Regions:
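Condensing-enzyme catalytic core mediating Claisen C-C bond formation in acyl metabolism
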Residues: 1-28, 40, 229-294, 298, ...
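Conserved active-site "lid/cap" helical segment
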Residues: 2-65, 69-77, 81-84, 168-177, ...
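N-terminal extracellular/periplasmic Venus flytrap/periplasmic-binding protein-like
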Residues: 9, 14-16, 27-35, 44, ...
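Active-site nucleophile and cofactor-binding loops and adjacent substrate-binding regions
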Residues: 66, 85-94, 249-253, 292, ...
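Active-site-proximal alpha-helical scaffold in enzymes
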Residues: 88-120, 170-199, 259-266, 331-332, ...
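Flexible glycine-/small-residue-enriched beta->alpha junction loops
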Residues: 113-169
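Active-site pocket-lining segment
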Residues: 165-167, 210, 280-349
Length: 396
């Protein structure tokens, strides 16, 4: 049967709280965070771990994590040894691409039940020592930050931070510092309110940590409550002396994981499961690496063409706030009102664990649609290298 007759559905979703850099989740490696999200998603799906055929998890900073991070996460979650596992790296789109791969594998009939998501511990990314293998011989060496080199710097213009491209985007669209800061303040207020009011309780799987001799459960996102709203307008530009992009109107360095359980609708019906969302379609858009910031515009356009939807027919959007200007550009180009976009806050507030965010925004989108009794949602995010992914969902 084809996609229309027997579509791919999501039967459960879970994420960890988003931990601040060197914060409450610093004691967890990426596979441990992934294991927590997978375990929660499988339990919420009310299926046996043995029913999971495949696990696909995004992870952008694998150095020092050991072999096959997705395999570690799956086994750590209690899945059986027979479960196939794959780790993928598509930069910030890794977690969403994992779900896209899962969708297509299920559609092809290669698997019946797949867990897909992403994980990242930016806190635990190691430092790298180039040339050490051959021998430095004499003189000064160099130490590279794995997080910066493989996560936050452009691969084509070596050493150039991604934030400088956000500056170019701000200039192109004439987004003022004030406009970016106002967007960020709104994101923070939404994220703080969502956490305080328990709006994320449906999606978050609490994490147990040790504080001294006591055990504590982390049940809320950490970063939104570290921000000082009054100081946002006083921060210095982070990437250019006369720039407008700051540490506040950029995403926060974070730790976290998210996971989804996907299967065909017929497989869900066979198990007596009620799907929480149907995957209507997905799209990838690629362009000039220097303009990764505007790639979601193209991904959304392609997604609308594939689904037959238009921008106004979508109830809610999650467009990742790698930088405020990324989301602002997509909103401007597609005419999206802010009251439909990132309604519970975005990465400027919650943080952006790069391998996890693509799955995290899908989980959060489903949660928001459920909360407000809405039906259609679209998630998208920019990807270093000039790409973007987008996914369309529909609730029952």
């Amino acid at each position: 049967m084809n996609q229309d007759q027997d579509p791919i559905v999501i039967v459960s979703a879970a994420r960890t709280p988003m931990g601040a850099f060197q914060g409450e989740l610093k004691g967890f490696a990426a596979p441990q965070l992934g294991a927590a999200a997978i375990r929660a998603a499988v339990e919420r799906a009310k299926i046996s771990p043995a029913e999971v055929n495949e696990v696909i998890m995004g992870c952008v900073l694998p150095a020092g994590q050991g072999q096959a991070p997705a395999r570690q996460a799956a086994l750590g979650a209690g899945l059986p040894l027979a479960t196939g596992c794959t780790t993928i790296n598509k930069m910030c789109g890794s977690g969403m691409k994992a779900a896209m791969f899962a969708h297509d594998l299920l559609l092809s009939g290669s698997s019946e039940v797949i867990v897909a998501g992403g994980m990242e511990s930016m806190t635990n990314a190691p430092y790298l020592l180039p040339k050490a293998r051959a021998g430095l011989r004499m003189g000064h060496g160099q130490v590279l930050d794995h997080m910066f080199y493989d996560g936050l710097e452009d691969a084509y213009d070596k050493g150039r931070l991604m934030g400088t491209f956000a500056e170019d985007t701000a200039a192109k669209y004439q987004f003022s510092r004030q406009a970016q800061d106002e967007f960020t303040v709104q994101s923070l207020k939404r994220a703080q309110a969502a956490n305080k009011q328990g709006l994320f309780a449906w999606e978050i799987a609490p994490m147990a940590i040790k504080v001294g001799k006591e055990e504590k459960f982390v049940e809320m996102d950490e970063q939104p409550f570290k921000a000082n709203l009054e100081k946002i307008s006083t921060l210095k530009p982070a990437f250019r002396k006369d720039g407008t992009v700051t540490a506040a109107n950029s995403s926060s360095i974070s730790d976290g994981a998210a996971a989804l359980v996907l299967m065909r609708r017929s497989a869900a019906e066979k198990r007596g499961l009620a799907p929480i969302a149907t995957v209507v379609g997905h799209a990838t858009h690629s362009q000039e690496p220097a303009w990764f910031t505007t790639a979601p515009v193209g991904a959304l356009t392609k997604l609308f063409e594939r689904t037959g939807w238009n921008a106004k027919q979508v109830d809610l959007y999650e467009i990742n706030e790698a930088f405020a200007v990324v989301t602002m550009a997509a909103m401007k180009e597609h005419g999206l009102p802010h009251n439909k976009v990132n309604v519970h806050g975005g990465a400027c507030a919650l943080g952006h664990p790069i391998g996890a965010s693509g799955a995290r925004i899908v989980v959060t989108l489903i949660g928001a649609l459920r909360k407000y009794g809405l039906k259609r949602g679209v998630a998208s995010l920019c990807i270093g290298g000039g790409e973007a992914t987008a996914m369309a969902l529909e609730l029952p």
